[in-house]
């Protein structure tokens, strides 16, 4: 009997991307792809991500279809789908939970630890995007881009901002970071 991997796909990591784990079949695994929430639209997906952040994995619903495949699963691969205590308890043979993101707030870590299940994440996955955003946000703040945009949209035209005394001379800028972005 093949060992089962349950790969739960969503709008962020879709079925085609998850299908790439079929390379593990040569090691005796059977890959089962299941959708986190059937026909989830973009707004529902965003709300689900917010729910994971606010309510945790046990307070965020997931398709009941997922539970059909958990009984003999040794590995669960997920992106943003919650892996609740109920899911972990349903997966009697579970050894590994892998999330394709840096954060692990979508996984009930306490339940995984109690069962001795290894949890694997993808540290640094968003490091380049975070670094890009950080530099862009700094420029936006220094040059008053968001303030000016909002001001113009509401009929204003501010000429002098509170940071004007130093925003014109940004020759010296130091970035200190502790993330994996430096490695990329």
Regions found by a protein language model. Name each.
Residues 35, 123, 162-163:
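Short loop/turn and capping residues at structural boundaries
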Residues 158-174:
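A short, basic/flexible loop-to-alpha-helix module at the beginning of a structural domain
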Residues 64-67, 85, 167:
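Short hydrophobic/charged patches on amphipathic alpha-helices used for structural packing
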Residues 177-182:
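Conserved small/polar residues in nucleotide/adenosyl-binding loops
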Residues 1-75:
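N-terminal glycine-/charge-rich "phosphate-binding" loop or analogous flexible N-terminal tail
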Residues 71-154:
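Phosphate/diphosphate ligand-binding glycine-rich loop within oxidoreductases
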Residues 4-5, 172-176:
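Residues that mark the start of a beta-strand
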């Amino acid at each position: 009997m093949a060992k089962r991997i349950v790969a739960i796909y969503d709008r962020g990591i879709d079925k085609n991307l998850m299908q790439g784990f079929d390379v593990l079949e040569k090691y005796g695994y059977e890959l089962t792809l299941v959708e986190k929430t059937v026909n989830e639209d973009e707004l529902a997906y965003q709300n689900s991500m917010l729910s994971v952040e606010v309510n945790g994995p046990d307070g965020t619903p997931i398709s009941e279809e997922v539970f059909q495949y958990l009984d003999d699963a040794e590995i669960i691969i997920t992106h943003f789908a919650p892996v609740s205590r109920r899911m972990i308890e349903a997966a009697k043979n579970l050894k590994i939970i892998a999330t394709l993101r840096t954060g692990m707030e979508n996984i009930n870590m306490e339940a995984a630890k109690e069962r001795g299940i290894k949890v694997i994440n993808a540290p640094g996955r968003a490091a380049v995007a975070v670094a890009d955003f950080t530099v862009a946000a700094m420029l936006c703040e220094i040059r008053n881009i968001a303030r000016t945009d909002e001001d113009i949209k509401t009929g204003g035209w501010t000429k002098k901002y509170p940071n004007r005394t130093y925003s014109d001379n940004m020759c010296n800028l130091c970035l200190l970071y502790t993330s994996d972005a430096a490695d990329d």
